[in-house]
Curated annotation (Swiss-Prot):
Disulfide bonds: C39-C57, C220-C236, C346-C352, C370-C378
Coiled coil: none
Keyword Hydrolase found: yes
Organism: Penicillium expansum (Blue mold rot fungus)
Protein name per UniProt: Polygalacturonase
Family: Belongs to the glycosyl hydrolase 28 family.
Keywords: Cell wall biogenesis/degradation, Disulfide bond, Glycosidase, Hydrolase, Repeat, Secreted, Signal
EC number from the UniProt entry: 3.2.1.15
Any one of the GO BP annotations: pectin catabolic process
Active site: D218 (proton donor), H240
Lineage: Eukaryota, Fungi, Dikarya, Ascomycota, Pezizomycotina
A Gene Ontology cellular-component term: extracellular region
SMART domains: PbH1
Molecular function terms from GO: polygalacturonase activity
């Protein structure tokens, strides 16, 4: 087909008009995100824009983002190698709901906090002393680190005033968390903060947490299931200490090859704790606590029990979750006079076996309570 001069000029004129048409101004927080670009989001619409554009970003910077009430900052399914950077202060609208407030997943993901940043849960809006036990005041969990694979990292985050549990680590492997600070000290006021666990780990492999500082009102660390887990260089204050379990009653009931070391537990309810669910089945094997310093422990310096239930301990330990290969090396410190130095409640000598305890010295509390404890322990 031969185009006449008038047709060509008409076509070019139309194209020129189209190019000259004004482009609508981008709303606050939104960015055009061609695949592999560095994306930045801010303000009240930043969360929605980040969620919509995440697939096309090689890096995502969140600057003073305000996440709407009842909305998860959903950064799941990120492209491999994506970097996520928190800048300024990240806040969340108030609503009674289960959360989470933040969720991130992917392979080789790098999450970090810029200098001076803060992720502020403003938990006092929910705190009522009941934590996640309330049926009327539902509180959002904070940060789901689920299905983070490869060599993913979470580095240098500053988190304040979580409504309830902070980090839920599930279905992840090869994840390293370093230099995280969780400051829930405000929850101590009138004992309103509750169930504010620092790190809950389940169904995960090869998880490393180093240099964490945790002020809270529940477990600093709780490993409910998982293998090849390292926690070192931690500081835990005000909560329930370092916990294995409770183990049992879940789809995955195996905790194996865990090394917890060089950590201080201060002004907490418990120091070192291992909990097996009464009547359940599972495995706790190859757990080591090394170079743990305790001070101001109010209830149990070291407690290892096979009769845990949600309502407390039954006093009649069972044997379905054997605790084997447990090592305590240089675990030392003080318990208050109303607490107990060491409690061991095992269902039988066979269900608690292969333990190695060296340089264990806990004092200041009531006399040890020991049932079917391996020799050389208490």
């Amino acid at each position: 087909m031969i185009l006449t001069r008038s047709v060509v000029l008409g076509f070019l004129g139309s194209a020129s008009l189209a190019l000259a048409s004004p482009v609508a101004e981008l709303a606050e927080g939104s960015r055009l995100t061609p695949r592999g670009s560095a994306c930045s989001y801010s303000g009240t619409s930043g969360a929605a824009a980040a969620i919509a554009g995440k697939a096309g970003c090689s890096s995502i910077t969140l600057n003073n983002v305000v996440v709407p009430a009842g909305t998860t900052l959903d950064l799941t399914g990120l492209a491999s190698g994506t970097k996520v950077i928190f800048e300024g202060t990240t806040t969340f609208g108030y609503k009674q709901w289960a959360g989470p407030l933040i969720s991130i997943s992917g392979t080789n993901i790098q999450v970090s906090g810029a200098s001076g940043h803060l992720i502020d849960g403003q938990g006092s809006r929910w705190w009522d002393g009941e934590g996640s036990n309330s049926k009327t005041n539902i509180k959002p969990k904070f940060f789901f680190a689920h299905s983070l694979k490869g060599s993913s990292t979470i580095t240098g985050l500053n988190i304040k005033d979580s409504p309830v549990q902070v980090f839920s680590i599930s279905g992840s492997s090869g994840l390293t968390i370093s230099g995280v600070t969780i400051d829930n000290k405000n929850g101590d006021t009138n004992s309103l903060g509750h169930n504010t666990d620092g790190f809950d780990i389940g169904d995960s492999d090869s998880i490393t947490i180093t240099g964490a500082t945790v002020y809270n009102q529940d477990d600093c660390l709780a490993i409910n299931s998982g293998t090849n887990i390292v926690f070192s260089g931690g500081y835990c204050s005000g909560g329930h200490g370092l916990s294995i379990g409770s183990v049992g009653g879940r789809s995955n009931n195996v905790v194996e090859t865990v090394h917890i070391s060089s950590t201080q537990v201060v002004n907490s309810q418990n120091g070192v704790r291992v909990k097996a669910v009464s009547g359940a089945t599972g495995t706790i094997k190859g757990v080591t606590f090394q170079d743990i310093t305790l001070s101001g422990i109010t209830s149990q310096g070291i407690t290892i029990r096979q009769e845990y239930t949600n309502s407390g301990y039954t006093g009649s330990p069972t044997t379905g979750v054997p605790i084997t290969g447990l090592t305590l090396n240089n675990v030392h410190g003080t318990v208050t006079s109303k607490g107990t130095d060491i409690t061991i409640e095992c269902g039988s000598s066979a269900s608690c076996s292969g333990w190695t305890w060296t340089k264990v010295a806990v004092s200041g509390g009531k006399a040890d309570v020991c049932k079917n404890a391996p020799s050389g322990t208490c």
